[in-house]
């Protein structure tokens, strides 16, 4: 674990001042909006690196990132792993909305009864 003041963006990256402040924010939730290719994924990876390596996100707490697309989800997970290592990255979960919803259904499927009951090998139908 490193001190909050000692944290610097991984991979020798230099973040512009507003991005650096956002990456190091410890009290507020943030909304990050920008166009394609503006660096949103990298910003999220750096923020996760900060939260995990400084202990701001203390064990056993985890970080959840939800994306629309599979490639965005896996890209973000891989970036976090490269920045803070496998051990800390194991506390970073990155899913698509559909994959996250399926995890919830799988976890609570045994308690669904009546018309909501699902078989063990249930399938999700296409549209």
Name each model-derived stretch.
Residues 1-115:
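P-loop NTPase Walker
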Residues 117-127:
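Coupling/switch/interface segments within P-loop NTPase motor domains and analogous charged loops
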């Amino acid at each position: 674990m490193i001190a909050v003041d000692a944290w610097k963006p991984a991979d020798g990256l230099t973040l512009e001042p507003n991005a650096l402040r956002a990456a190091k924010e410890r009290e507020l939730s943030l909304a990050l909006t920008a166009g394609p290719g503006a660096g949103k994924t990298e910003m999220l990876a750096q923020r996760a690196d900060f939260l995990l390596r400084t202990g701001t996100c203390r064990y056993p707490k985890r970080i959840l990132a939800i994306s629309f697309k599979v490639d965005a989800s896996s890209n973000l997970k891989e970036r976090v792993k490269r920045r803070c290592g496998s051990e800390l990255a194991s506390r970073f979960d990155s899913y698509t909305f559909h994959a996250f919803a399926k995890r919830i259904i799988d976890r609570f499927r045994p308690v669904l009864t009546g018309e909501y009951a699902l078989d063990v090998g249930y399938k999700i139908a296409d549209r």
